[in-house]
Amino acid sequence: MPPPILPTANITIHPSPLTLSSFHPFGTAISSPLPATLRAPSATSLSSLPNTDPNPSDTPTPILANQSTALKYSPISVFQNNYDQSKSAEGRGKSKDGVPRMSMFSCFPRALRRGGGRGRKPAGGLFDVRILERHPYTTQTFIPLGVPSGVDRKRPENENKSLSTGARNKHDDGDNGNPVPSYLVIIAPSLHGQTAQATVVNAQGRKEQVLIRDPPDLRNMKAFIAHGGQAVTYGAGTWHAPMVVVGRRRVDFVVVQFANGIAEDDCQEVAFGEGIVVDVDMDVDITEMEEYEDEVAKL
């Protein structure tokens, strides 16, 4: 059955950079507190390395680990299992336990339509938000694999060749002026204790009215731009869009959460018609995206 459709007004969201403090009301933004250019410090300097987090109190105090060759920051994110509160337990006195689950989502670039940019530059476009989901009893963490961080793409060519990790491939997205893939984190707080009326099409094709518990607060939707050096944890019950990758390259995410196999407990969805858009005003060339989509269509 398709997800219920909520009515909505026209809403345009302008994304901001993903930071620990800006995302704190909705979950956890995860990134290294160390300078991106740091490669091989001396062992004696590990305990006094600079912290790039603008709010050091938000970052756990590191401890030396691995025979004093590493710094361990713990905990860096909440890992929450609230399945003992699940609605499926009502009427039978016992819930089905949530168990840890690790998955991989290979996310391909989303289509943007022309427009937006607030007149500042031709790059970017509009992303139409047509669906939100939430996991009412579990956090959900997305960890991107193999994507350069935003700082990596700004290094001069001669510095790339001198890195202790080896020279980068000349075809990397960070070279030759190609934008590094980024992703949008689109969220809406839950209106706890409230309900909203939505329309659903039943198995017979008839429209029915249903009530959505703890619906998304669409007036306070936000979007954040994240790069490959950042992971994100959605708080339990936080409404969010499925992952939105922008650019010309697939991004693979390792996803960590709890689940119990009961659809209504694990994931709840609401859909929308036209009206909610994110103005993706960033280093994404809409013409290149259209050419990329044409190439994919020919495969």
Q: Positions of the model-derived regions?
A:
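Non-catalytic, conserved peripheral segments adjacent to functional cores
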Residues: 1-219, 223, 262-265, 271, ...
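Short, amphipathic alpha-helical segments
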Residues: 136, 228, 247-248
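A short pocket-lining beta-strand/turn micro-motif at the edge of beta-sheets
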Residues: 181-183, 222, 230, 249-252
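Conserved metal-binding segment of the jelly-roll/cupin
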Residues: 225-242
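Double-stranded beta-helix
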Residues: 245-299
